[in-house]
Swiss-Prot record:
One of its GO terms (molecular function) is SH3 domain binding. It is found in: Cytoplasm; Nucleus; Cytoplasm, Myofibril, Sarcomere; Cytoplasm, Myofibril, Sarcomere, Z line. Component of the sarcomere that tethers together nebulin (skeletal muscle) and nebulette (cardiac muscle) to alpha-actinin, at the Z lines. The modification Phosphoserine is found at residues 101, 131, 644, 759, 813, 818, 867, 907, 928. Residues 945-1320 are annotated as: Interaction with ACTN. One of its GO terms (cellular component) is Z disc. Its main location: cytoplasm. Disulfide bonds join 290-341, 456-515, 1094-1146. This is Myopalladin.
Length: 1320
């Protein structure tokens, strides 16, 4: 850009000189025109300044012709300010302008305006590829438009002047604007013609700091179109102001303030009301509102997941002043996502974002689909089967793989720019967002026709997409296979419960079930086995017999490696990326553990680096074994077309949709990487040929149908038994095989639903070469391995495969990791904590990791004694049946001790334990078993705890020892807590001893079990990234059962599977009662319903007895015992009385024993409510004026009533003078008037009210004059209740017999008053 400006500088200088002459002639050579002011602060109006267009870096003498040395130096300073211009520096620039002398402004006023112009100029660069002739249009030389030309060229001069000094600061600053004038002129014309502008997401990157960041030229063009509109409007104002100024006189002595005007105060956009996240049901109307302010009014754009939204029939964008709204007329699943609103003006940008969740889907559902479709489209041509006898040359498939990865990498960059609301660390990046299983699938065993439920829990941000697979085949939601996914109840508990319900299982449903959760940050899977017991014995050996199907493999026996021994190796290719080691991940059913695949693709790793061993994908078990489509080094290839390891593998997909083989390879890479740390590679490589390669295929594979063994001189052979079966092996040119590695095939027999692991105990030693024979007669062979200098040649071994068409070997070729791999990459980062092969020895007798149950050492010794003997086909056939029987037994039964047996619990028990774990993971804990401390704000990469090995269920007899063992990994090292039946076990507990090893293995040991130890044991691991737990059940049986169990343990090896299966229910029939749920002490109200609920387990189902204070509770009208379908027992008491208070004890009893719990029930007395009742009514009375009078009444009620007094139906306030109200606890109420006046005469009413009701009574008060004596009425009245009534009725004057104070107790009782009061 700078070079273009320099090359065009000469023509600019010439144009400015011509413009200067034309302007001088137009002004009549008036000297005052030099000081002509401009009304637009963004431009300048000096003809001399216009002529100063000297251009290049080497044309400074041209500038000196128009400027003095002092002005030239000042131009340099102002040009530097123009490059580094920042809106926050306006005040400093204003002061700088004031410091210029009037003389300088008179001769060079352009210098005063230069900073103001450059404020907008950096936002107006355009393409520099336009024709240079654009600057020489005739309109710039016209005298009629000389003012406009002068103003435009003067602005260009400042830009040209600034370009002279860019080279001095280019090493520390790359200017974002001030490109050459040719492209700018054309861009301005385009803006005037199109009257449109485009705004990019990259507008967020506009810096307000004094040092701008580099921005590509193509993005700068889009960044400034809006600013050009503002600038064009100012230019039009400048033309009008200039024409007005041309008619007036401007003297050289004008005030400097007249040379420029202050720019209107502006402010960047700011959202006063931000968008709010919402969750709405599908089909409803959604509206997002925000309010943004800014000067000038900002331009607003809407985006959904990084894509700009425009007005359409479905989406309406409305602006009402500062209020901006986005309305979705009808929301559907595809509308779920993150919506952002960006506002920008020439002073800056601002944005706000919100998540829209459509009920029933997650925000991640709208992501990843294009990549998935693209991957499927690329993979479809590769899913082609070849005949068994087809030979093919295997070309590298790197170009295809590179095309596969190109698009996702771009998507990753866009996703990183979009705002997120994930948990962030100190660096502002998400700590971790990959999915994590907080509850994994459990292995299940069921009978035909039963209901089976697989359940797991997963969390991740954004919400992961969950898919279910059976033997690698995707399961769709159907009436037979119901897929349920419960969304998080709140943001505080982001767990999703994923469930697969099989309404009715059959024998063919047996197999491996996988639940895969994925979002844009990674993929994680949980695997479990389902075993369906059919009507026939699935282990019938006769169904597995075959005549002539054998497979021979050369392998290396595990043996201790000398500290300085050099394992055979070869030279590495330039950049080996994806590596693996052949490992058997299938254990016997009795000890199989949950498989876990985790793909940690952390945001800080998405920076354009190549995919390599740093890809961070780890897996612990291979899934989808029947899938023909395989992947090597991240590439999708056909089975007979593996890629060459010489080529560099493509980068990792941004949203990986990994199949089982790729995950298996990456996991094996971690295993071998740690193994190499323990066995360093040699300094001098030597050749180590190993056939069955699919990663290095420079020669065509030798494929033959002969049933004989075929020896190939090279190690480039590759064969297929059937198009579906795939045999990868080690890499010829990139293998570093340590003496402790032991490749083992894992065979899967789908029709019989039994997985068999080929152990070394059943392998027969053969010649030092490798052969692989299949029913089709295809053969794969390896040459003998040359011995190492310090290592004897390991004897290879052979195993036989009956009925080869029913097995599919599942293995991954071991390719070592480069010794120069960075430790910072996720693979090396996880290699120290994830499952690995121990150094010495790496495997047990079965070729499994040492933690798996191994076979008797005697059997291994017997096999080793036969190792020097050659083996032929006859010997293999003779031992075939024995091998099959041994494999079946070792897969089906675990090698357990008589006193500690592992067993399988029912699905009901499993769900109960899941409930306990779910509650514990959300309950505060008291203490941990160790002194591990975690930072409040974690730093670096963090990984939530993961169980590499889970707790098992044990059945022991009283007095026997038992040990619960599991292995936990996580970063940072998790804290560990142990619980029994939901109650935390203290680390000071002497009975239960807790231990923790350095490799993450945790154990709980009970030396001598008692009946109280029976229950559920749970271990919970926690670190700042989350919590995870798993449980194991301990069944403690009484001594009479021990002999039966011992005999069963001694004879179970000689029984068939049918007998073993028939025997299991007999053992499970004796299950001591165990309370899974029990109520605590309760307080209940008398007269209400009281319910005591408990849940108990046991076989046979126990009987419950309730005791109250030691006496049995018998069922009657108010006491009922109920049992619900869920197994909850309830004692109902309705209504509750005081007699029901006391200590309750519930006893559960069955054949094996009993269990009980107690609680205290307190009964709160029932509150008595009674409506008010008048015991003594108000009495009519009359008193002389001036005397006191008392109106009395007595009312009772429960609770005590509240009294209200009224006179002539108007409430009497308590503050009225001469009137006071009194009452006591006995219900006595009194209204005292002292002294009485004429105005007090009238009808008085007393109302008594409580919660139960209200009652009232009324009486008449008469006031007489002092001389008046009451005359008895002529008519007879009934006797009054007053003690003075009889005297009054006889005409006696009571007032004459008592003092004035005593007269207040007198009640007048005329017949009229009494009768009327009674009626009221």
């Amino acid at each position: 850009m700078q070079d273009d400006s320099i090359e065009a500088s000469t023509s600019i200088s010439q144009l400015l000189r011509e413009s200067y002459l034309a302007e001088t002639r137009h002004r009549g050579n008036n000297e005052r025109s030099r000081a002509e002011p401009s009304s637009n602060p963004c431009h300048f109006g000096s003809p001399s300044g216009a002529a100063e267009g000297g251009g290049g870096q080497d044309d400074l003498p041209d500038l000196s012709a128009f400027l003095s040395q002092e002005e030239l130096d000042e131009s340099v300073n102002l040009a530097r300010l123009a490059i580094n211009y920042d809106p926050l520096e306006k005040a400093d620039e204003t002061q700088a302008r004031k410091r210029l002398s009037p003389d300088q402004m008179k001769h060079s006023p352009n210098l005063s305006f230069e900073p103001n112009f450059c404020q907008d100029n950096p936002r107006s660069p355009t393409s520099s590829k336009e024709s240079p002739q654009e600057a020489k249009r005739p309109q710039y030389c016209s005298e009629t438009q000389s003012k406009k030309v002068f103003l435009n060229k003067a602005a260009d001069f400042i830009e040209e002047l600034s370009s002279l000094f860019k080279s001095h600061s280019s090493k520390r600053i790359r200017p974002r604007a001030c490109k050459n004038h040719k492209s700018k002129l054309e861009s301005q014309n385009k803006v005037m013609q199109e009257n449109s502008s485009s705004f990019s997401d990259l507008s967020e990157r506009r810096e307000r700091s004094s040092v701008p960041i580099p921005i590509p030229a193509d993005t700068r063009d889009n960044e400034v179109n809006h600013a050009l509109e503002q600038q064009e409007a100012k230019r039009r104002e400048a033309e009008q102001a200039a024409s007005e100024a041309a008619g007036g006189d401007t003297t050289p002595g004008s005030s400097p303030s007249s040379l420029y005007y202050e720019e209107p105060l502006g402010q960047p956009p700011r959202f006063t009301q931000k968008l709010r996240s919402r969750e709405v049901p599908e089909g409803t109307r959604v509206q997002l509102d925000c309010i943004v302010v800014g000067i000038p009014p900002p331009q607003v754009r809407w985006y959904c997941e990084g894509k700009e939204l425009e007005n359409s029939p479905d989406i309406h964008i409305v602006q009402a002043g500062n209020l901006h709204s986005l309305t979705i007329a009808e929301a559907f699943e595809e509308d779920t996502g993150r919506y952002s609103c960006f506002a920008s003006n020439i002073y800056g940008t601002d944005s706000t974002s919100a998540e829209i969740y459509i009920e029933g889907v997650s925000s991640s559902d709208s992501e990843g689909d294009p990549n998935k479709e693209e991957m499927n489209r690329i993979q479809k041509p590769n899913e082609v089967s070849s005949p068994p006898t087809t030979s093919a040359v295997i070309p590298p498939a790197v170009p295809q793989a590179q095309h596969l990865v190109a698009q996702p990498r771009v998507a990753t960059i866009q996703q990183c720019q979009s705002p997120t609301n994930y948990l962030q660390g100190l660096d502002g990046k998400p700590i971790i967002a990959a999915p994590v299983f907080t509850k994994m699938l459990q292995n299940l065993s069921a009978s035909e026709g039963q209901l089976v439920v697989f359940e797991c829990r997963v969390k991740g941000a954004p919400s992961p997409k969950v898919e279910w697979y059976r033997e690698g085949t995707l399961i769709e939601d159907s009436p037979d296979f119901r897929i349920l996914q419960k969304k998080p109840r709140s943001m505080a508990e982001p767990e999703e419960i994923c469930t697969l319900v099989i309404a009715e299982v059959f024998a063919e449903d047996s197999g491996c079930f996988t639940c895969t959760a994925s979002n844009k940050y990674g993929t994680v899977s949980s695997i479990a086995q389902l075993h369906v017991r059919g009507n026939e014995d699935l282990s019938n050996n006769g169904s597995l017999h075959s005549a002539n199907s054998t497979t021979n493999l050369a392998a290396i026996e595990p043996q201790p490696s000398p500290p300085h021994s050099e394992p055979p190796s070869v030279e590495q290719p330039p950049k080996p990326k994806l590596e693996g080691v052949l490992v058997n991940h299938n254990e016997p059913r009795s000890s199989s553990r949950i498989g876990l695949r985790v793909h940690f693709n952390l945001p800080e790793d998405d920076k354009g680096s190549e995919a390599s061993s740093e890809a961070g994908v780890v897996t612990t078990r291979q899934t989808r074994p029947d899938s023909f489509q395989e992947r090597f080094n991240g590439q999708a290839t056909k089975t007979p077309e593996p890629s060459s390891p010489v080529k560099e593998p493509p980068p990792v997909l941004a949203k990986p949709k990994l199949d089982s083989t790729q995950l298996q390879q990456l996991h094996n890479q971690v295993l071998l990487e740690q193994h190499q740390l323990q066995n360093p590679p040699p300094s001098s490589p030597k050749e180590f040929p190993f056939s069955m390669t699919v990663l290095n295929s420079n020669a065509p594979p030798a494929v033959t149908t002969s049933s004989k063994q075929v020896k190939a001189p090279s190690s480039q052979t590759f064969s297929l038994a059937r198009p579906k079966y795939f045999f990868p092996s080690t890499n010829t040119t990139a293998a570093t095989v340590a003496p402790s590695s032991s490749p083992v095939f894992t065979l899967s027999s789908t029709p019989q639903t039994i997985q068999r692991t080929v152990s070394k105990e059943s392998l027969l030693v053969s010649h030092p070469s490798v052969q692989t024979k299949s029913p089709g007669g295809l053969s794969i062979q390896n040459e003998p391995l040359p011995p190492g200098p310090t290592e004897p040649t390991p004897p290879p071994f052979t195993f036989s495969i009956p009925s080869g068409n029913q097995f599919q070997p599942r293995c991954v070729s071991p390719i070592p990791v480069s010794p120069t791999s960075r430790i910072q990459n996720p693979v090396a980062f996880l290699s120290s904590v994830l499952p690995s092969l121990p150094a010495i020895p790496p495997t047990n007798a079965m070729g499994l990791p040492r933690s798996a149950p191994s076979m008797p050492s005697q059997g291994l010794a017997k096999k080793n004694t036969k190792s020097p003997q050659p083996v032929n086909d006859d010997n293999i056939r003779e031992t075939k049946n024995a091998v099959i029987r041994d494999l079946g037994k070792k897969i089906t039964f675990s090698d357990v001790r008589p006193n500690q047996q592992e067993y399988k619990i029912s699905s009901f028990e499993q769900r109960l334990m899941n409930e306990i774990e779910f509650r514990l993971e959300r309950t505060p804990v008291d203490e941990s078993d160790d002194e591990i401390q975690h930072d409040e704000i974690p730093t670096g990469k963090c990984i939530a705890p993961i169980f590499d090995k889970r707790l098992k269920h044990f059945r022991v007899t009283e007095g026997s020892p038992v040990t619960f063992t599991c292995k936990i990994v996580g970063i940072p090292v998790p804290k560990v807590y142990w619980f029994k039946d939901g109650k935390q076990i203290s680390k000071r507990n002497e009975h239960c001893k807790m231990r923790r090893e350095g490799d993450g293995t945790c154990s709980l040991h009970i030396e001598s079990t008692t009946s109280d130890d029976d229950g559920n044991y749970t271990i919970m691991a926690a670190n700042p990234q989350g919590r995870i737990s798993c449980s194991g059940h301990l069944m403690v049986q009484s001594l009479p059962i021990r002999s039966r169990l011992t005999s069963a343990g001694q004879s179970h090896r000689g029984r068939s599977r049918v007998q073993e299966r028939d025997k299991e229910p007999l053992q499970e029939r004796f299950f001591r009662p165990h309370f899974l749920q029990a109520p605590g002490d309760m307080v209940a109200h008398e007269g209400r319903l009281c319910r005591l609920d408990c849940k108990v387990s046991g076989l046979p189902p126990p009987e419950l007895t309730w005791l109250l204070n030691g006496q049995p509770v018998l069922p009657d009208a108010s006491h009922k015992m109920l049992v619900r379908e869920t197994g909850v027992h309830s004692l109902l008491i309705d209504p509750l009385t005081q007699r029901d208070a006391g200590t309750y004890k519930c006893i559960a009893t069955n054949k094996t024993g009993q269990n009980s719990f107690s609680l205290e029930l307190s009964v709160v007395a029932k509150e008595v409510k009674k409506a008010p009742v008048i015991l003594e009514k108000l009495q009519n009375c009359g008193v002389p004026e001036g005397h006191p009078v008392r109106l009395e009444c007595r009312v009772i009620g429960m609770p005590p009533p509240v009294f209200y007094w009224k006179k002539d139906n108007e409430t009497i306030p308590c503050t009225r003078e001469r009137i006071s109200m009194h009452q006591d606890t006995t219900g006595y109420a009194c209204l005292l008037i002292q002294p009485a006046k004429k105005s007090d005469a009238g009808w008085y009413t007393l109302s008594a009210k409580n919660e139960a009701g209200i009652v009232s009574c009324t009486a008449r008060l008469d006031i007489y004059a002092q001389w008046h004596h009451q005359i008895p009425p002529p008519m007879s009245v009934r006797p009054s209740g007053s003690r003075y009534g009889s005297l009054t009725s006889k005409g006696l004057d009571i007032f004459s017999a008592f003092s004035s104070m005593e007269s207040t107790m007198v009640y007048s009782c005329s017949s009229r008053s009494v009768v009327e009061s009674d009626e009221l």
